[in-house]
Amino acid sequence: MDSASLAVVVWAILLVLWLRRIFGQRSSLPLPPAPPGYPVIGNLLDLANNDVHIRARHWSRNFDDDVISLKVLGKTMIILNSPTAVSDLFDKRASNYSDRPDMPMIVDFIGWDWTFALMRYGPRWKEHRRVFNNHFNIGTSGASEDRHIQLRICRELLSLMFQSPSKYLENLRHYTGHIILKRTYGHTVVDEEDPYIRLVEAASQSTSEAAVPGAFLVDLFPSMKYIPEWFPGAQFKRKAREWRKLSEAMINAPYDMAKGKFDEGNAEACFVSACLEQNKTASGQGLSEELIKDTAAVAYAAGADTSVSTLTTFILAMTLYPDVQKAAQAELDALLGGERLPDFGDKTRLPYVTAILKEVLRWIPVLPMAVPHRAVNADTYKGYYIPAGAFVYGNAWAILHNPDIFADPETFRPDRFIENPTLLNPIDNGVFGFGRRACAGRVMALDTMWIAMASILAVFDISKAVDERGNEITPPVKLSPGTISHPAPFPCIIKPRSKAALELITQDD
């Protein structure tokens, strides 16, 4: 059979499977309201611009409903645009909405089946999350050691910001990556060319691209995973083959390094060495190597990339809103007197700095549409039908940019959290996911971001860059494409606030 005939046969089979999906699930109740689509492809074109979170809010307003739906190649997507809808399904009906859908591109082809963030809800997910919680969550015996690591590496960040302020993004990657690598693998990062930081950056970027809703049809049309790589439309397989190499290297390379040190008897205290030591002294069956390796990679991959994005947003906000920066510095000066750097013991006495962190998370949420949940069984909500297997998204961006909750939501204004202490907290409403699938490492991430923001504000002034004519350059609020909202690169000026601030920056050099 020639390739043209084979193509016709394969696509005919896929069409039959699609028709079975379309007509296989029926209900007397309607789906939630949806924008108009096209025959066969449905709303596929609405996913093309990487702005579904913004469009979904627009549709929600037009329909005067906080729940909307999309149909893409016969697959149903449900988008929840309010904290009430999110709580009703992801919290109150967690048993039906804590699963993840099949994501062939990321899981099957790129090979991210090791991360419990994407695992199906069940015993394997629970085991991986339990091990993570036992070692990384605050309140455990390792909490003070975590903060010691964060403080020490934050001091390094200040030195890097002074030495090369124009390379703030590389400095932030060094900071967040070093904390995770030290805590997880006992690895010391020397400079920005560290191979493990470069590796996680490349691997995370590939996954961010792959996770965009509708970016790869195989996620909406899983039958496509069976077509051969040379077949028309199978370019995704070739791309995934290259990305899989990054995934495998990210899982194995730092683990092999840490295990090698442990076997030689010179391992530093870290997650991997703690697990391996636990296995040596365990009376019964210890943790499998796969479980240790997988859990370490989750911390390595998730912690570094999202925290970098948030801290870059912080730098952007301070560049654009100097009055906010001055207010935070006044709070810090009143407490510290310019004589020392902040530490975690100061947190309760720096409410405005904490408000800045909340506003950064609200203004540009790292995961605007979060990761989709899956309806295990067919369900009804508000008189609408939700079919089994539907992708169910919590639209964090729509929730955190709702003008009925946050006045003037496009403006960066931390004062809103000071003026109204009961205002919806972004930390608990989408920034770290929803329900039982909320990010397990959020406490460590929040500490990493808070101490960096407080320390930078204590000793640096951040302002707009100027062009060759001396005119200020106002950076646009522009995001790079991908699932994770990274601010596009922008120039700014970062310089010590004073001679006393410079002495604090260089005191440990």
Curated annotation (Swiss-Prot):
CDD domains: CYP64-like. It is a single-pass membrane protein. It is found in: Membrane. Heme binds at C439. GO terms for cellular component: membrane. GO terms for molecular function: heme binding; iron ion binding; monooxygenase activity; oxidoreductase activity, acting on paired donors, with incorporation or reduction of molecular oxygen. Pathway: Secondary metabolite biosynthesis. Its EC number is 1.-.-.-. Cytochrome P450 monooxygenase, part of the gene cluster that mediates the biosynthesis of melleolides, a range of antifungal and phytotoxic polyketide derivatives composed of an orsellinic acid (OA) moiety esterified to various sesquiterpene alcohols. The first step in melleolides biosynthesis is performed by the delta(6)-protoilludene synthase PRO1 which catalyzes the cyclization of farnesyl diphosphate to protoilludene. The orsellinic acid synthase armB produces OA by condensing acetyl-CoA with 3 malonyl-CoA units in a three-round chain elongation reaction folowed by a C2-C7 ring closure. This is Cytochrome P450 monooxygenase ARMGADRAFT_974139. It comes from Armillaria gallica.
